[in-house]
Amino acid sequence: MDLIDSHAHVDVSDFDADREAMLGRAQAAGVGTLLAIGNGPEIEKLGAAVPYAERYEWIYAAAGIHPHEARHATEAHYAELDRLARLPKLIAWGEIGLDYHYDHSPRDVQASVFHHQLDQARAAKRPVIIHCREAWPDCLRILDEAWRSSGLGGIFHCFTGTEGEALSGIDMGFLVSFAGNVTYPKAQNLRDVAGLLPLDKLLIETDSPFLAPQPHRGRRNEPAYVTEVARTIGNVRNLPAEEIAGVTAENFRRLFGISHSRTRSGAVPEEHHLTSDREGNL
């Protein structure tokens, strides 16, 4: 299968004992491209995904301040993110957004940090990866006010909302990504949404090491298991998993302006996400 795992945390300590083997299993399963996510709260951890993108041709990186960590954000964090955005394989800003389920950071602080990073991502011409949990009205409002006009779009990562919320995001240029929780027996609502949305607006991910799909539930998740997400969505839509894999891979490439050969070779994305001025400073 031609698979892209659009969201994985491969830098975390869960993989320290077998990271090389884990990445090998991903490739053996057909994962030709992986987007590795770096988040704080420590400044040096914002770029935690970058070394993997620089080492492995098939891995790209993203960086951002997670809403859980918004209370830790400082000007130094923002400056580090601006620096990271100049790196050629840092192709997305995130994950960023709002989380009202845990409220690890005050909601007004989450909103402020979210706004700030949207401004930075717009300046850097990077699509954004959105984390939204139980905060859809505020999240969609902020994106409508501060992001829609950028034309850069992004990803609703690990989507858990309604069809209407997904369509609102799609209207603003977002793709909707489903993770391992779409496979859970009690997640029929998510499967319904995955079956109703336009196929050219879907992505799949693992959110590794979290949310292992049903066959592996209760254990550590890893990128190879993105096949289970493709299979589940394929079952919902009466399509082979291979077709879900191929279409979602093309959706990812289209968002980031990269060709099939470039996702396999790890080349730098097309010019429309890297301005000539910024390329001169890479």
Named regions from a protein language model:
Residues M1-L282:
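Mid-domain alpha/beta scaffold segments of enzyme catalytic cores
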